Amino acid sequence: MVEWSIFNEIFAVAFNVLYFVIIIGTIFIVILDNRNPVKTMAWVLVLFFLPIVGLVFYFFFGRSTRKEKLISKKGFTRLIKRPMAEYQAQKAFKCPDEQYQLMRFFRKVNNALPFEGNATEVFTDGYSMLYSLMKEISKAKHHIHLQFYIFEDDPAGRLLRDLLIDKARQGVEVRLLYDDVGCWKVPHAFFDEMRGAGIEARSFLKVRFPLFTSKVNYRNHRKIVVIDGRVAYTGGMNIALRYMKGFPWGIWRDTHIKIEGKAVYGLQTAFLTDWYVVDRTLITSSRYFPEVGIFGKALIQIVTSDPVGEWRDIMQGLLIAISSSRKYFYIQTPYLLPTEPILMALKTAALAGVDVRIMIPARADTWITHLGSLSYLDDIMRAGVRIYLYQKGFLHSKLMVSDDILSTVGSTNMDFRSFEHNFEVNAFMYDPSSALLLKGIFLQDQKDAILLQRKTWIKRPWYQKAQESIVRLLAPLL
């Protein structure tokens, strides 16, 4: 009995020492990673005050992959051979002087090729987007490439799935990428039925316990469809019935665009790069980059960002865009958890006299991110930023427009997760027509929103302020 007691004591001491070494070692690794100090401190606090939970969360969500590469430089050069030839063959296009720096930045760090002669169509509801998408898919002759964060097994998902199966049986190549976490609850049989019909369906960065758990944090949030290399779609909408029907308490308001023209090359490149990541097959045939004519006047640059690149491409581009704005900068985002550079840029622009407006939903789909968003409002309103709370339903739109010349629509939210952890894609449009159209959409939505008054906001209950402040500490981790 005495020997057993001594053994228990020795085991307890050894366990505590090992546990202490692991926690301190993990904190040391976090510090040595030289990340953003705010994010580093958030992880240190979690590991220190909630060691067991913090250790599990760090193992799942905290490890950085910024020094890895998705595709070799040689492979990427082969992939963009045709788009590069088309880009170099363009006559000198006109880019507004104010936006040239932004375009050059994306060209240098993101290999994003700007193309003129594009036409766009904007969708603000799921019904019109899905109808247009299925109409174009029905015309497909050679290939259909689809990529979504969420592809639900519901009436909307099954409707699109059945059409894709029909096209595959007609001999059209169909490739589908879906995010493994975003589609976690979708039955395997749903995608297996597609595979049985000849559709190549792959999940992005599979999460299988206990292996590869660190992949949970790095998700593919992109929404891309490319049909025959001639028409493409991107924006904020996934494939699920709620994107059309909304919630019992309101509509689902989103923004998606259809692109015709050579800018489609950029979305094709993004899809094929991600396809290479999961399938290890590099698809470079010119059939996926056909000759494309002139469809309109829009100058468009497709920009991607990911958690493995050296730079935070889209976030840094937005910093340039905000800093370059002279008259106004309007933003729609479902989640407002900005990084410190973005936060400072917004406040600086407003203090310099730029009309900065941010629209977020009055009611969100997740309470914790909504509390985090609310924690930033007083700070930015004090600098003169106008905050609008959308009342008609859930605002999921990721839209930005500035000075009647620059606009962007895509999958990127104004939060740490989109800027740091997700694979994202946005279409940046240097075009007055596109900017004015999206500005009009923002102003129309403004009629269904209330302008938040700071003098009223600061009087909210102390316990709400406390909740917001606590959640804000975790903002870099959400």
Briefly describe each language-model feature range.
Residues 1-316, 320, 324, 364, ...:
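N-terminal localization/anchoring segments of enzymes in phospholipid and broader phosphate metabolism
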Residues 321, 325-327, 335-357, 361, ...:
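Helical hairpin unit composed of two closely spaced alpha helices linked by a short loop
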Residues 372, 384:
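CN hydrolase (nitrilase-like) catalytic-core segments centered on the catalytic cysteine
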Residues 387-391:
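Active-site donor-binding acidic/aromatic loop of nucleotide-activated sugar
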Residues 398:
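Catalytic-core elements of nucleic-acid end-processing and repair enzymes
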